[in-house]
C-alpha cells in the first residue's frame, strides 16, 4: 500500500474519529500478514483515557469508511486500541498508581558522576521524589530530576 493511499484512509478515519471526540494517534497497515492487519490507535481529544466502549463504538463506523472508500481491495483484520501506558511517569496520577513499582530516575546533576538511580517508587511531593534503594529511602530534590520511568529490576 502506498503512502498516498494510507494518507487518504487516515484522513477519512480522522473524520469518523472526530464525530466521537477522538483522534487517530497512528494508523499502521501490515501488508506482510494474510489477511492484512489495519491497526488504528485512537486517543480522546480531551486527553481522557480510552475505554473498551470507545474502541467498540468506533469499530463499525471505521469499517464502513474503509469498505466504502475502496482503498483496500482485499480481506483485512481491523484492530482498534488505545496508546497504552507510557513508561515515563509525568502526572500526579501516574506517581500514585505506580507507587512501589521499580523506576529509573534520570538526574540533572552536572557535577555528579551519578546520572541515574534505580529503586522502588516510594513517594512524590512537590519538593522531592523518594525512592527505595535496597531498603533505604533516598529523597531527591525535584529540581534535580529530569525523568522518571518505569523499569524492570535485574538482580
Swiss-Prot record:
It comes from the Bacteria. NCBIfam families: PRK14646.1. One of its GO terms (biological process) is ribosomal small subunit assembly. GO terms for cellular component: cytosol. SUPFAM superfamilies: YhbC-like, C-terminal domain, YhbC-like, N-terminal domain. Coiled coil: none annotated. Belongs to the RimP family. Its main location: cytoplasm. InterPro entries: Ribosome_maturation_RimP (IPR003728), RimP_C_sf (IPR036847), RimP_N (IPR028989), RimP_N_sf (IPR035956). It is found in: Cytoplasm. The keyword Cytoplasm applies. Required for maturation of 30S ribosomal subunits. It comes from Prochlorococcus marinus subsp. pastoris (strain CCMP1986 / NIES-2087 / MED4). This is Ribosome maturation factor RimP. The gene is rimP. Gene3D superfamilies: RimP-like superfamily, N-terminal.
Amino acid at each position: 500500500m502506498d503512502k498516498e493511499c494510507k494518507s487518504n484512509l487516515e484522513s477519512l478515519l480522522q473524520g469518523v474519529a472526530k464525530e466521537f471526540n477522538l483522534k487517530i494517534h497512528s494508523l499502521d497497515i501490515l501488508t506482510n500478514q494474510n489477511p492484512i492487519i489495519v491497526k488504528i490507535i485512537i486517543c480522546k481529544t480531551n486527553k481522557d483515557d480510552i475505554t473498551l466502549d470507545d474502541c467498540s463504538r468506533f469499530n463499525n463506523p471505521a469499517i464502513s469508511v474503509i469498505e466504502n472508500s475502496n482503498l483496500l481491495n482485499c480481506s483485512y483484520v481491523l484492530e482498534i486500541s488505545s496508546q497504552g501506558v507510557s513508561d515515563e511517569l509525568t502526572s500526579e496520577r501516574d506517581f500514585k498508581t505506580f507507587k512501589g513499582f521499580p523506576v529509573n530516575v534520570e538526574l540533572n546533576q552536572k557535577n555528579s558522576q551519578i546520572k541515574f538511580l534505580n529503586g522502588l517508587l516510594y513517594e512524590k511531593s512537590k519538593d522531592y521524589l523518594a525512592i527505595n534503594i535496597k531498603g533505604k529511602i533516598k529523597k531527591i530534590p525535584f529540581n534535580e530530576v529530569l525523568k522518571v520511568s518505569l523499569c524492570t529490576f535485574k538482580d
